[in-house]
């Protein structure tokens, strides 16, 4: 799926859905076909390997620059239903900065990006590309923290039920949440390295306020790492006490 959006003007941040690619637009690509990838590469001049990179769910967080195109790959959090229970996972998202456009590519539709489409983000403009990247990164941190709080609440509820009566279902749910914390921890630590590198990229140093925003994102990411580690230690302790 390919969606092309453009902010109406400097004074109006509402998005217009376009039929064709224009300078200053945002190209949002979700689970694309090979034909769609070739089309985007041809129309934008972005290397096909940049567009394909996030479609490998094992792709790690990184920054790469080639012929004036910068790709930032970060892991973003998702929720999924599995056996009538909400589970948490991460998938790669590519944010590609070119001279004329911003392109996002992901295997799945993400709340992080639909929030921009649905007008939930203030002062968002598709043509302010470096600021847009930072706003996406900030939204990713927000969802990590939100999902970590959800995991915390779910874990406490399950632990209370387990102490009343040992049930396989609760144990399975607890192990599932532990797995989610491992995914989050790995992804957040990889993202941290990418965010630190982003501070040194020339295109992100144009405006001093952008650097401030990026530093705030790095702080939030560190908070999410700390929350993940604390919750994971508590999980391990709880599972050990239950198996004793």
Predicted region positions:
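Peripheral, non-transmembrane regulatory/ligand-interaction domains of membrane transport proteins
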Residues: 1-207, 213-227
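Single conserved hydrophobic/aromatic residue that forms the stacking wall/gate
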Residues: 235-244
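Function-determining sites in protein domains
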Residues: 231
